[in-house]
């Protein structure tokens, strides 16, 4: 909150504005992205996809569950959001973020109602599907870029990688140790990891590229 704003409790006022006031979140984000793109967007821009975890103590925050928490480096009670960032040689900034809802929430309508989760946000989506939707939204607004970078949590997903290829996007994804590398000739929709560590006498490569 602006330091000169005359309110008794600025932090509480901000929480009330964000959580209870009526305002168009998507319109605000669209305006923010347009402002940042005007200054920093480049054709060589890179989209970065990753999890953002928010440690929590209770059980009432939307989407909270016990899972690996990157912020703490261990399994803990936390929220998990899919985030998309944009990077160029001159700048790096967040584009969008959406909470991931695990089955423990989606299978409990009463819990969703109590937390005030809108009906349109109750879809059963993988994190990869959420990431693709966030990418589509940013690119539909004209943000340039043809390369996506993602961690292993996304790189292990064939539908996610295929979705990127179908959109004409190249990608660099970390992979799980149990995966091999993709054949260079693999086609969209039929790509399968191939472990060639035995052929090379060493460990399999740990990145997937297309």
Model-derived features: positions:
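Short, well-ordered coil loops that connect the C-terminus of an alpha-helix to the N-terminus
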Residues: 7-8, 42, 90, 144
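Active-site-proximal, Lys/Arg-enriched surface segment
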Residues: 22-103, 108, 113-114
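Charged, flexible boundary elements
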Residues: 13-35, 127-133
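Catalytic cores of large soluble enzymes that bind and process phosphate-bearing ligands
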Residues: 6, 24, 123
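An internal, acidic/charged active-site-proximal segment
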Residues: 110-210
């Amino acid at each position: 909150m602006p330091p000169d704003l005359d309110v008794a409790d600025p932090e509480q006022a901000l929480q009330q504005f964000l959580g209870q006031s009526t305002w168009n979140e998507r319109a605000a984000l669209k305006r923010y992205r347009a402002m940042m793109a005007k200054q920093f967007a480049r054709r060589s821009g890179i989209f970065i996809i990753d999890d953002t975890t928010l440690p929590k103590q209770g059980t009432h925050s939307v989407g909270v569950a016990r899972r690996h928490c990157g912020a703490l480096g261990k399994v803990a009670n936390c929220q998990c959001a899919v985030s998309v960032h944009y990077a160029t040689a001159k700048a790096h900034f967040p584009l969008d973020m959406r909470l991931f809802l695990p089955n423990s929430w989606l299978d409990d309508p009463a819990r969703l109602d109590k937390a005030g989760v809108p009906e349109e946000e109750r879809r059963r989506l993988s994190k990869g599907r959420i990431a693709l939707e966030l990418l589509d939204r940013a690119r539909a607004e004209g943000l340039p870029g043809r390369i996506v970078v993602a961690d292993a949590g996304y790189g292990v997903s064939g539908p996610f990688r295929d979705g990127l290829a179908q959109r004409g996007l190249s990608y660099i994804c970390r992979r799980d140790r149990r995966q091999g590398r993709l054949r260079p000739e693999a086609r969209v929709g039929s790509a399968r990891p191939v472990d060639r560590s035995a052929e090379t006498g060493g460990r399999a490569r740990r990145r997937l590229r297309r």
